[in-house]
Swiss-Prot record:
Cited function: May act as a tumor suppressor. Inhibits tumor cell growth, when overexpressed.
Protein name per its UniProtKB record: Tumor protein p53-inducible protein 13
Membrane topology according to the record: Single-pass type I membrane protein
Transmembrane feature ranges: 305-325
PANTHER family the UniProt entry points to: TUMOR PROTEIN P53-INDUCIBLE PROTEIN 13 (PTHR34179:SF1)
Biased composition annotated in UniProt, kind: Basic residues: 361-372
A GO BP entry: response to xenobiotic stimulus
Spans within the Extracellular topological domain: 28-304
Localization annotation: Cell membrane; Cytoplasm
Lineage of producing organism: Eukaryota, Metazoa, Chordata, Craniata, Vertebrata
GO-annotated cellular components: cytoplasm; plasma membrane
Region Disordered, residue ranges: 361-388
Signal peptide from the UniProt entry: 1-27
Organism for this UniProt entry: Rattus norvegicus
Amino acid sequence: MVPPPPPPSRLLLVALVGLLSLHEVVAEPAEEAGTRCPEGLWPLPPQVLPRVTYTQVRQGQAEGITFFYHPCAHLWLKLQLAVLAHLCVAKPTLIPDFSLPWDRPLVLTAWGTALEMAWIEPAWAAQWLKRQWRRRRRKQRKSVWFLSDNLFGPTPMMPAPRRGKLCGRRCVQAPTLAFALRSWRPPGVEVTSRGPRRSSLSVVKKRGLRAALGLQSTPSGLRVSLASSQSLKAQQRTLGNSSVAPVSLMTGVTEGNGRFRTEAQMPSGQGNPGGCACPGQVSPAPRAAVPPRVARGPTPRTEEAAWAAMALTFLLVLLTLATLCTRLHRNFRRSESIYWGPTSDSQDTVAAILKRRLPLPSRRIKRSRRRPLLPPTPDSGPDSESSD
């Protein structure tokens, strides 16, 4: 009898294991080989949200990105952690740690902070790694100002590249890894629904992630007060107008392995696979809300344009009224009056009316300039001239 074909999730898992060659990922296989779990491997823990804690760099541990896991953790969890480490870090370092609890057997540390996970959350891990890497770069840039310009090469404030460098030639987008890890569930394990928040999980998880990753405790383990005005303003700017519940902080608890933890409880829900651990690539990770632009006042050109528009409108209205008045005046017919005499066709012109109404001036007799002033004498006639 032919056995049934394996499910697609198992085929995808085998393909990824062969592609990544995970037998080269584990840094200390000899230490894990000598350990034995008396009760066997642990069952899968309940799926809870990751937790950001403060940790100290141990002796012999390279400063950078390190992946810790409990040797008795479930095989699926260890395999997912190895795949995540190989995809997000160029040369990952995986170290077994017996001090990890059962509910969160996977820990990701980077430059003094740790991300404790019960299940692998690629979006959380990628966004958290990128955030820590940016903080590290900002600190290094600030420290450069205090160094001398004559120093060359790596300095204590700017360590040289080593194992644990973020990203590499096999860096993969976090959504791709999240899609693969969602199908990596042991047989019989199903992801339970989270209730009515299922529809808005992506927005809630993204903004809750940014609010949680910014919470780091101090070595004293003091309680962070939610009544402080600065923290409230920062959370309001980060969360925006969403329906995310406020982050509840708990007091820091000092553990035996030297970590001071601060729990950040956020809204439950499955993470939306967004963000990438690569700093040089464009990431669809959640971003801070863009502040509204300040309204600018009117400029001289806008005022001139407004005045020109008003003047054109006034001229147009004036021209329209003049045209209407002219049409009405032409079509208007005057009735008979006592002042204006009746005419045959009632079409008298102004000149005709003036000629008829104005009195004619009296004519004066003009004297000719050729007439003599003295009357003629009888001797000065033409007969006397002819007799001479």
